[in-house]
């Protein structure tokens, strides 16, 4: 067996070996020459599903989530059911919670993003129909 020249990388607790070139020159690269990390299964070891859409809000561990969460994971994820049953997926840029219109803020209804109440004078919106009750928001 020829000595293998390569890089051993460690990033975020995941290690992998990437072979640079076969040392003896006649050996071809194959999947056997690369050690890949095991499949990630974070949120309470449920099954990751990629085809479905995130459901917001969802309840996980007696807490209501209005957007993707890091709870129990190194990566943002969401539930595929309103009450988490083990079906989940990692969030992509298209999965994050959307603004809810109209929403109530300080007893008044708004149909667009607002700057009122913003410390940094940026437009924001509520992630629920009633900001006064839930207090969840994001910048627009």
From Swiss-Prot:
Residues of the signal peptide: 1-25
Covalent S-S links between cysteines: 54-78, 68-91, 99-125, 113-140
Protein name, per record: Seminal plasma protein A3
Organism: Bos taurus
Ranges of residues in domain Fibronectin type-II: 49-93, 94-140
Biological process annotations from GO: phospholipid efflux; positive regulation of sperm capacitation; single fertilization; sperm capacitation
PROSITE patterns: FN2_1, FN2_2
Record has Signal as a keyword: yes
UniProt keyword Disulfide bond present: yes
Predominant localisation class: secreted
Function of the protein: The BSP-A proteins from seminal plasma exhibit both simulatory and inhibitory actions on the release of pituitary gonadotropins. The exact function of these proteins is not known.
Family: Belongs to the seminal plasma protein family.
Entry GO terms, CC: cell surface; extracellular space
Entry's localization field: Secreted
Key words, A-Z: Disulfide bond, Fertilization, Repeat, Secreted, Signal
Any one Gene Ontology molecular-function term assigned to this protein's record: heparin binding
